Regions:
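Phosphate-binding/switch region of NTP-binding enzymes
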Residues: 14, 20, 137-221
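Glycine-rich phosphate-binding P-loop
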Residues: 1-3
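Helical mechanochemical/support elements of P-loop NTPase systems and associated helical scaffolds
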Residues: 34, 38, 63-66, 70, ...
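Short secondary-structure boundary/capping segments
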Residues: 41-47, 123-126, 172-174, 209
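Flexible loop/turn segments at secondary-structure boundaries
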Residues: 33-39, 88-89, 114-119, 165-169, ...
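Phosphate-binding/switch loop-helix module in NTP-utilizing enzymes
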Residues: 78-149
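Cytosolic-facing regulatory segments adjacent to core modules
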Residues: 9-104
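Generic beta-strand/beta-sheet core signal
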Residues: 28-30, 82-84, 110-113, 160-161, ...
Length: 221
């Protein structure tokens, strides 16, 4: 976490977070509204209050006060948000460079890799010959460019992309279901496909749960 404090549910109080004072982070969003959608997620995490309580303005005892204090924490933290709906690589680089130079940002979260009209126009302008670019070519180029930005600015960069309709095939949940450009998987240092486990997958770990964890089920699916 990058917040300077967070609510510890065991201690029932806010506690300092040394990682929050030593690191600056930039979130670049392309779809979700920063104030209405992204900030409530952050406040829910910092205050340990269910997000729907914040969105519905329906608080249990003590939650409203915690959210108010979480707003103050967010303002004091080195957490920066930028909204870039129709992005291209040039815009991303300008945004990242600004925060690296002005705020000493070293961690960037980009939500998320997908096709935009500006992106297509940018790559077509850079192409040596006028040609119709395929979606997989554009997305693969985005992965290459983002990798170059991490080296150029010495930053870590986390991002996401979509999966294709093949995700429904329970026997084929690997890099081949990345939507548009399977080559994206070749550009990442660490990646994962986040999905709820199937019944068959849960059965496979039953022996481990029984022998190691007393049969306790995972608390996150």
């Amino acid at each position: 976490t990058f917040a300077v404090e967070y609510y510890d549910n065991k201690l029932k109080k806010f506690v300092p977070n040394p990682h929050g004072t030593q690191n600056a982070v930039l979130y670049i969003g392309t779809e979700m509204e920063l104030v209405d959608e992204v900030e409530p997620i952050m406040l829910a995490y910092i205050a340990d209050v269910p997000q729907d309580h914040i969105m519905d303005y329906d608080y249990a005892e003590g939650e409203y006060e915690r959210v108010l204090y979480a707003i103050d924490i967010l303002n004091r933290s080195q957490i920066y948000l930028e909204y870039v709906p129709d992005y291209d690589i040039s815009t991303l680089e300008q945004t990242i460079e600004k925060y690296v130079l002005q705020k000493n940002v070293r961690h960037v979260y980009f939500d998320y890799i997908h096709i935009t009209t500006d992106l297509i126009a940018e790559f077509q302008g850079e192409a040596k010959a006028k040609m119709q670019l395929r979606e997989d070519q554009v997305l693969a180029n985005v992965g290459t460019k983002l990798k170059e930005l991490t080296r150029k600015y010495d930053i870590s960069l986390d991002t996401w992309t979509q999966v294709s309709g093949d995700w429904k095939n329970e026997n084929n949940r690997d890099q081949t279901i990345i939507r548009g450009a399977k080559a994206l998987s070749d550009k990442v240092d660490c990646g994962s496909i986040m999905m709820r486990p199937t019944v068959a997958e849960l059965r496979k770990i039953d022996p481990i749960l029984k022998n190691r964890f007393g049969g306790q089920k995972p608390n996150l699916y």
